[in-house]
Amino acid sequence: ILMGVGEKRRELPSEFRGELLPNIRAAEPFCRGCLVLEGESFENDADLAKKVAADPRFAEWQMIVLHDRIEYARSAEKFLWATWTRFDPARDIFSAETKLERNHISYSGPCVIDARMKPWYPAEVEPHPDTVKLVDRRWQEYFPK
């Protein structure tokens, strides 16, 4: 997804300048060509990713990831974790056009991943602040260089 080979085909956008759809609160690029959208919860708009994929104002973006929080666009660690642990490839990938070519699915951009929390997912587990402080304080003891 983030690799290209061969001759350059297009300029990848680095900024979103359009008007947002209803139920989309924010848009920020994660990297050139990959836009993160903060959208309404899955419970309140289950078809939002499908709407984004079909909307022409997002046509210049090759990859769009729909999240619950825009902050995931601001950190590679958060983006990768929140994206790849919160979508099911069989049900959460949408595109402007989908074709079957030689028994392979072919997506035409934008390709939208719905990485919002779903009602059937377990709740996020957050560490207790005291535990975080203890581990941070003793990290070198646990894992000396």
Predicted regions and their residues:
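Charged, compositionally biased interaction regions
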Residues: 1-145
